[in-house]
């Protein structure tokens, strides 16, 4: 492997969240030292994921099925839709095991600074799902940040005129907090004590 190929690997690893240039360099060296036990299985797993995992056309989560296993599960409560920023937030709620409804993954939050508008988040898809029924409540499980609150208000303005209850997570989610970093107990309490937006 030439230095250029190693540099390319380091550069790609550095693009992953939480990995800077130094961490990416260490990860690359670790992979290279453990080719058979780590790098080859990792390449195999990445290839399999790239070939089989896709976004659910209904809710936007990642799955090997379309629609995903959550959307296809008849035991899930179709009257509740929990709106989350991204798949990591959905996984955090599923880990808690307290929500039995369906989800809608936005894929981000509204942000004038970053140029992210309602059309970028597929809010029209959410409105269409609500209009199709049998939804009676939309739970906004969004971060307690400026962008999260802005997104929540836009969604509430879109959904409430349809006569649907719109609620948000209650206490337990700190201002500026990220759902993926909360412990299961805090997340469970916040979901159970949700409130109208």
From Swiss-Prot:
Keywords: DNA damage, DNA recombination, DNA repair, Metal-binding, Zinc, Zinc-finger. CDD domains: TOPRIM_recR. A zinc finger (C4-type) spans 56-71. GO terms for biological process: DNA recombination; DNA repair. The keyword Zinc applies. NCBIfam families: recR. This is Recombination protein RecR. It comes from Rhodospirillum rubrum (strain ATCC 11170 / ATH 1.1.1 / DSM 467 / LMG 4362 / NCIMB 8255 / S1). The gene is recR.
């Amino acid at each position: 492997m030439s230095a250029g190929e190693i540099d390319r690997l380091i550069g790609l690893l550095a693009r992953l969240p939480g990995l800077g240039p130094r961490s990416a360099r260490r990860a690359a060296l670790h992979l290279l030292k453990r080719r058979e036990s780590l790098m080859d299985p990792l390449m195999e797993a990445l290839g399999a994921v790239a070939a089989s995992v896709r976004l659910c056309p209904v809710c936007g989560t990642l799955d090997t099925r379309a629609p995903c296993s959550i959307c296809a599960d008849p035991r899930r409560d179709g009257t509740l839709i929990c709106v989350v920023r991204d798949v990591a937030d959905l996984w955090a709620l599923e880990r808690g095991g307290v929500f039995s409804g369906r989800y809608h993954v936005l894929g981000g939050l509204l942000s004038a600074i970053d140029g992210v508008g309602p059309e970028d988040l597929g809010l029209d898809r959410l409105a269409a799902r609500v209009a199709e029924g049998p939804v009676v409540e939309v739970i906004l499980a969004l971060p307690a940040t400026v962008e999260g609150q802005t997104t929540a208000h836009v969604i509430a303005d879109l959904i409430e005129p349809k006569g649907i209850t719109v609620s948000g997570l209650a206490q337990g989610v700190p201002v500026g907090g990220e759902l993926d970093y909360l412990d299961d107990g805090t997340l469970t309490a916040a979901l159970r004590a949700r409130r109208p937006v």
